[in-house]
Amino acid sequence: RPDRPSLIDASSGRSLSVEESARLTRGLAWYFHSLGIGAEDRIVVCVPNSIWHFIIHAAASWIHAVTVPLSPLLPDKQRQEIYELVSPALIISADGHPVDGVSALPLSLIEERALQAVNQSPATWEPLTCYEQTAALVFTSGTSGKIRAAQLSHANLWWASQCFRDG
């Protein structure tokens, strides 16, 4: 059911259908691929919560890249430390803040890039199969107060989504 609602942005009220979400995901995956981003490359997502977190993650998963979600409220020094730890291939942020030697993309251009790229992707281009590969690095300080990355596989995220969905 391609017209069924897929994602709803709570802050803006924007709703995407299954078809729209799939089209944006495919286009963004091809855009990342065209930048030379591939398996195990890191894509930092440092933007306020929105539907784009999901679309960016799904697009990165398509090519086996790893998303690294970061709060835009983190102090600059802490963000810089994380950038040094993960060596991102791309940083997506609200303002497109550049980091030495790393491509930056402002969130405001994501949809435009995805829609341009979707028409360039081959019709036969399909997501790569993945399961145990790293899907995301989630930074936490835990009880120690020292920032650490929790490495989550696609299987971890699938299990978590099923638990959330099924209660």
Language model: regions and residue ranges:
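Conserved AMP-binding/adenylate-forming core of the ANL superfamily
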Residues: S6-S50, F54, A58, P75-Q80, ...
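ANL superfamily adenylate-forming
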Residues: S93-Y131, S141-K146
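Conserved ATP-dependent adenylate/AMP-binding module captured primarily in the ANL superfamily
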Residues: H57, V68, P72-D100, L115-N119, ...
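Structured catalytic cores of enzymes that bind and process phosphorylated ligands/cofactors
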Residues: S21, S61, P69, I82, ...
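Conserved pre-ATP/AMP-binding loop-to-beta segment of ANL
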Residues: P2, Q120-F139, K146, Q151, ...
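Structured binding elements
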Residues: H64
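Conserved S/T- and glycine-rich ATP-binding loop of Class I adenylate-forming
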Residues: I43, A60, T134, T140-T143
